[in-house]
Amino acid sequence: MQSTESKLQSVSAGVPQGSVLGPLLFLLYVNDISDNLLSLTRLYADDSSLFCSTTSLRDMEGILNHNFQLISAWSERWLVNFNPNKTEALFFCNKNTQSNPVLRFDNTPINFVQHHKHLGLTLSNNCNWNKHIEIILGSAWKVVGIMRKMKFSLSRQALNQIYLSYVRPVLEYSSIVWDGCTVQSSHSLELLQNEAARIVTGLTRSTSLENLYSECGWESLSIRRRNQKICFMYKVYNNLVPSYVDDLFPHQRNLEHSYQLRNNDDFSSYRTRTTLFKKSCVPSSIPLWNSLDTNIRNSTSLSAFKNKVCSNPNKISSSHRFFYGKRYLSIMHARIRNGCSDLNFDLHNNHLRENSYCACSENIETAEHFFFRCIKYNTIRLVLFQKTRSLHPLNINLLLYGSDNLNYNDNVLIFNAVQEFIKSSDRFKH
């Protein structure tokens, strides 16, 4: 560089960094680290994990300490340095025990922890998922907090995309693994999504969850986790998973005997002694698969299978036209549509007003009265009818929801006219 040559140096160990081949060469370089080890080993990039399951604490100490000696010898031979101070151990036990195994790596005692993050999942020594869900909720609430501050400055479509891109993936990372979480943890996840849905749609807390999800086109997270487990089972059934995953499952019943049964394609269920094991990924996924109709199981592709299993009744085409309009007017339109607006009928139904009568007369101020009958808005009503004259006859459902029988441009024409009417009426607080 600039007529200056760098000095040559030899590389005694390791692989060059920054190249496409670097990760592959590194994997080849460390691939034999697990040879001759007495316990199960998992390698992922530059992370290594040892697993040992026994009924004897002394046996566990002997096996793992022997493995650490082999790893130390391997690292010395191949000039790869490990940091024993960063090595952690997590001890799972379904019995109350007062002591942990005594483990040493390069003459350094290994620290036992209550929680450890492994490939994005926080594992806890009591085998529950409270800590993991606490962490992902903390991350997700930060983004939802930002969404709340931008509720009236960003469009509905932008807020919807932020949630789907930056929040829901956090809430669903490896969710089939921790779906056996407590009811309280599952409820906390749903509360976060409900709040995000209210921010996106602009609806108030008086809106039912059924209307809220119908408005935004989402499903509950628990239903999505259930569907993801069923899709996971489809991959297992069709040998679309690695062998180490397939080995976790019991045989199908047609492999256990020679005679034909109606449920031959079912997986044999695990005999579960504890609720903890019963709610874990594999034992809880098998009954979901076995309950499916044979025609669904025999779908020719994963996409076809998903279309049959994961059909979302809330994901209606109208949700796209619900994105239309300036943010404030779009919110007012959505609130009228879902019965949580400042119309007196909605306020009365939500216990925020003593009566539901309109200020113009003794008629009840419903959405239909507001758009079609109230004498206070006769002039702007003529403008509404004039703009939508090509789509007459009008009705309240057409004004609030549009129609799947109309193309997008015609629905936009209706929504534009309705939102201009809302703006000109000056009926709602800004």
Task: Give residue ranges: language-model regions.
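Short, conserved micro-motifs composed of acidic
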Residues: 3-4, 66, 81-115
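Family-specific functional microsites
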Residues: 311-430
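Short, charged alpha-helical motifs in flexible N/C-terminal segments and linkers
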Residues: 72-83, 88-91, 111, 117, ...
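Basic, alpha-helical interaction scaffolds
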Residues: 107-177
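Short, conserved catalytic/metal-binding micro-motifs enriched in Asp/Glu and His
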Residues: 18, 44-49, 75, 118-126, ...
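Catalytic palm subdomain of template-directed nucleic-acid polymerases
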Residues: 48-73
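Active-site palm subdomain of RNA-directed nucleic acid polymerases
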Residues: 6, 23-52
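Short, conserved non-catalytic motifs in the polymerase core
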Residues: 1-25, 51-57, 107, 112, ...
